[in-house]
Amino acid sequence: GFNPCGETCIWFPTCHAPGCTCSIANICVRN
């Protein structure tokens, strides 16, 4: 499960990498 966005959003509800969004599983994924 490689995460190309390099972030999770369990503690912070935002993703800082461009083109990434928070998934239901609290992982930043490409949108």
Curated annotation (Swiss-Prot):
GO terms for biological process: defense response. The keyword Disulfide bond applies. The keyword Disulfide bond applies. Disulfide bonds join C5-C20, C9-C22, C15-C28. Keywords: Disulfide bond, Knottin, Plant defense. InterPro entries: Cyclotide, Cyclotide_sf. SUPFAM superfamilies: Cyclotides (SSF57038). This is a cyclic peptide. Belongs to the cyclotide family. The presence of a 'disulfide through disulfide knot' structurally defines this protein as a knottin. Probably participates in a plant defense mechanism. This is Cyclotide psybry A.
